[in-house]
Amino acid sequence: YSINQRTLFDENYDLARTQHLKNKDIPEGGAKGTILPNLGADPSRCFEKYVDSVLDLLIKDTSGIKEPIVDLVGSEEILFFGPDEGTANMMDWGAEHARLRGAPWWKSFTTGKTASTLGGVPHDEFGMTTLSIRQYIHGIINFLGLKEEDVTKVQTGGPDGDLGSNEILQSKDKTVAIIDGSGVLHDPIGIDRGELVRLAKERRMISHFDVSKLSPEGYRVLVEDRNVTLPSGQVITDGFAFRNRAHLLLKADLFVPCGGRPESINISN
């Protein structure tokens, strides 16, 4: 918690700046908000309270506001929430709650909603971010004259997420490692592609990977594991700590961050 607390401002600032640059062609611009729950807190409840507090600022004459709201713009503002780390399944609730609060723009308040019932464009189905990143990857591979099937890759963000699942489904490379919320999956000869596709389609973490499909050199270390001996003989005393730094230790031709660890690309890798 203390580590994340120390890096929270820098992480949020960098994400907000990136979002603003990405949204340079639309009038609303871009921003980012982060929520750091206390240990043991319910993330869903934290998100709900966060949304409620933002709606307090956006909806005129909201009851319960104890002090006058400082308005530096002088006009009504509209914000749009998009799904990010751990909030993809909360977008429906955000829109529905805005409707209950009487917001006239409730339907556009969140993106990535269930399209069949609330409309909008589903991020995962259209693979918005992943398709953009894929173009960069194809450009690099073509420039270097490589064959994608021979390129090794480490990926952060697992098959349960929007980006991670689409990256698996759209790629043909030799993925040697995937690091997600549940742990680390590694196979130096390439993780079984069929099993990865299965997890991606079912949107499940690597904790559900069939380890019988790993080679003798492959392994899976989950965050709750303790004192695990790897095929190399190395002993992992703490699976949680190993998960947090694995992306800095594993080697591959290509590193594709699909969420996961903050500041996963830095001067050391």
Features from the language model and the residues they span:
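Structured mid-domain segments that build the active-site/substrate or prosthetic-cofactor binding neighborhood
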Residues: R6, N12, L248-N269
